[in-house]
Amino acid sequence: MLGWIKRLIRMVFQQVGVSMQSVLWSRKPYGSSRSIVRKIGTNLSLIQCPRVQFQINSHATEWSPSHPGEDAVASFADVGWVAKEEGECSARLRTEVRSRPPLQDDLLFFEKAPSRQISLPDLSQEEPQLKTPALANEEALQKICALENELAALRAQIAKIVTQQEQQNLTAGDLDSTTFGTIPPHPPPPPPPLPPPALGLHQSTSAVDLIKERREKRANAGKTLVKNNPKKPEMPNMLEILKEMNSVKLRSVKRSEQDVKPKPVDATDPAALIAEALKKKFAYRYRSDSQDEVEKGIPKSESEATSERVLFGPHMLKPTGKMKALIENVSDS
């Protein structure tokens, strides 16, 4: 059987005019001799099939409602039209679908080129231009203005709520006083003590004046010395300053009436109303806490008592007797 097949193949190659050795061993990577099928096809006299040709029409001459039925040749436009038709059992050409006269909406649709619907994005389309920074700044300013308006409205609402609560508390207090009698209000806190009057300021002298007087005395006493000797610059002595420290008195500075008087508060300012309500609330809490501590009689700790009594000063230094000897030496000289 195999021998018969070989003889048949040899007979076919002999009729074609191709040797068996050249078919099996001589190969080229290109042309008609690269495979047996191509060699046979080039030597056989076969009739070629006609190629399919498509007619591409422009959009202007595609189809016009004035001449229906003239454009009956299938083109690539029909392919796009068929791809767009959904829910149809069979494909139809444009001439069959557009047998009726189109409306105005259809004319606008016909002017556009039929295109197939694809899910992938079209990269050929131009990207939308980004907003300029000026427009972004304007939008940010508008948002900021809107937020400021909302904050002002919230402040006004909070101030209104505070005033309503105060009015309700006042009315409730009046009703309680009429029914159960008036309760004496808590006395206001005492004002801070006034500074002591400045008496005897002209009698006491400052440390600077004493130093000046002693310098003048020394200058008068030093005139008897020899004028040729160079005079060394005198440095202030701290012992002299410390000696007269107890006789120094501070001046009392009176505050002006403008600083003492409180600033006028606008009754319509929502921030001022809120601040006043918070002050009242926390003052009431602080007063109640202090009253509870007084009633309970909580003793203060030893550290607090010592911190209140002990003050830093020269009385904390240990007496050595050296300071007294130095002061006596200075006074003798």
UniProtKB/Swiss-Prot annotation:
<protein>
    <recommendedName>
        <fullName>Mitochondrial fission regulator 1</fullName>
    </recommendedName>
</protein>
<keyword id="KW-0496">Mitochondrion</keyword>
<keyword id="KW-0175">Coiled coil</keyword>
<feature type="region of interest" description="Necessary and sufficient to promote mitochondrial fission">
    <location>
        <begin position="179"/>
        <end position="304"/>
    </location>
</feature>
<feature type="coiled-coil region">
    <location>
        <begin position="137"/>
        <end position="169"/>
    </location>
</feature>
<keyword id="KW-0597">Phosphoprotein</keyword>
<dbReference type="GO" id="GO:0009060">
    <property type="term" value="P:aerobic respiration"/>
</dbReference>
<comment type="function">
    <text>May play a role in mitochondrial aerobic respiration. May also regulate mitochondrial organization and fission.</text>
</comment>
<dbReference type="InterPro" id="IPR007972">
    <property type="entry name" value="Mtfr1"/>
</dbReference>
<feature type="compositionally biased region" description="Basic and acidic residues">
    <location>
        <begin position="288"/>
        <end position="307"/>
    </location>
</feature>
<dbReference type="GO" id="GO:0007005">
    <property type="term" value="P:mitochondrion organization"/>
</dbReference>
<dbReference type="Pfam" id="PF05308">
    <property type="entry name" value="Mito_fiss_reg"/>
</dbReference>
<keyword id="KW-0809">Transit peptide</keyword>
<comment type="similarity">
    <text>Belongs to the MTFR1 family.</text>
</comment>
<feature type="region of interest" description="Disordered">
    <location>
        <begin position="177"/>
        <end position="198"/>
    </location>
</feature>
<dbReference type="GO" id="GO:0000266">
    <property type="term" value="P:mitochondrial fission"/>
</dbReference>
<feature type="region of interest" description="Disordered">
    <location>
        <begin position="288"/>
        <end position="315"/>
    </location>
</feature>
<feature type="modified residue" description="Phosphoserine">
    <location>
        <position position="119"/>
    </location>
</feature>
<dbReference type="GO" id="GO:0005886">
    <property type="term" value="C:plasma membrane"/>
</dbReference>
<dbReference type="GO" id="GO:0005829">
    <property type="term" value="C:cytosol"/>
</dbReference>
<dbReference type="GO" id="GO:0005739">
    <property type="term" value="C:mitochondrion"/>
</dbReference>
<feature type="transit peptide" description="Mitochondrion">
    <location>
        <begin position="1"/>
        <end position="48"/>
    </location>
</feature>
<feature type="compositionally biased region" description="Pro residues">
    <location>
        <begin position="184"/>
        <end position="198"/>
    </location>
</feature>
